[in-house]
Amino acid sequence: MNKVLSCRSLGKRYQEGKLALDVLSGVDLEVGKGEHLAIVGASGSGKSTLLHLLGGLDTPTAGTVEVLGRDLSKLSETERGKLRNESMGFVYQFHHLLPEFTALENVMMPLLIRRMDKGEAARRAAEMLERVGLGKRLEHKPGELSGGERQRAAIARALVTQPACLLADEPTGNLDAHTASQVFELMLELNRTLGTSLIIVTHDLELAGRTQRVLRLNEGRLAVSDTVSA
């Protein structure tokens, strides 16, 4: 397998005085290039915590995370930030679009952070918005877009840098069933056409069943789910 992201014996413990809570313990995972998978589990099972660790947004108390063969624990915060910006995309339940900027300007942002020429950044952002079906909404601000359109814009922003892996935390959680299905299919389509690996945390078991692998997080441990029933 051509690994994009992996973790070994990953653990996360929260300490509050004498009370210790192990949220994750001994988690192993390998994600190949272009693979798409879902992580399911009960509320509070640590799904979001795992995604934050995989994305280098939080630090594990045990184990290692590697992105494109680079051990995150051996990188400085600046180096981790650079790796995230260059190799990873993030989509959340809430779109986190900046309300004062247009859809085009929001999607341009990661490219401008890379110090890309403004004209080229605008061209690439417009192209990605076209791919997600928002070619006619470039100059609309988030408040002028529907919930599904805002999430499509967030997906475009996450993918405009052509990351190796996209981490999505309940990306359809705020959408109605029909719109959620459309947005989920859009992510799978972009996974196929762009070759970006995709890890989706979701509580929607029907949507999870559309991915190549479904993993269940239970009592801090990750295992292949034989079924996507609750």
Swiss-Prot record:
Family: Belongs to the ABC transporter superfamily. Lipoprotein translocase (TC 3.A.1.125) family.
SUPFAM superfamilies: P-loop containing nucleoside triphosphate hydrolases
Binding site for ATP: 41-48
Cystine pairs: none
Signal peptide: none
Main location: membrane
Location in or out of the cell: Cell inner membrane
GO molecular function, one term: ATP hydrolysis activity
CDD domains: ABC_MJ0796_LolCDE_FtsE
Enzyme class: translocase
GO cellular component annotations of the record: plasma membrane
UniProt keyword Nucleotide-binding present: yes
Keywords tagged on the record: ATP-binding, Cell inner membrane, Cell membrane, Membrane, Nucleotide-binding, Translocase, Transport
Membrane topology annotation: Peripheral membrane protein
The protein's name in its UniProt record: Lipoprotein-releasing system ATP-binding protein LolD
One Pfam family, short name: ABC_tran
PROSITE patterns, A to Z: ABC_TRANSPORTER_1, ABC_TRANSPORTER_2, LOLD
Assigned EC number: 7.6.2.-
Residues forming coiled coils: none
PANTHER family found in the cross-reference section: IMPORT ATP-BINDING PROTEIN, LIPOPROTEIN-RELEASING SYSTEM ATP-BINDING PROTEIN LOLD
Record's function text: Part of the ABC transporter complex LolCDE involved in the translocation of mature outer membrane-directed lipoproteins, from the inner membrane to the periplasmic chaperone, LolA. Responsible for the formation of the LolA-lipoprotein complex in an ATP-dependent manner.
Occurrences of domain ABC transporter (ranges): 5-230
Subunit and interaction comment: The complex is composed of two ATP-binding proteins (LolD) and two transmembrane proteins (LolC and LolE).
One example of a Gene Ontology biological process annotation: lipoprotein localization to outer membrane
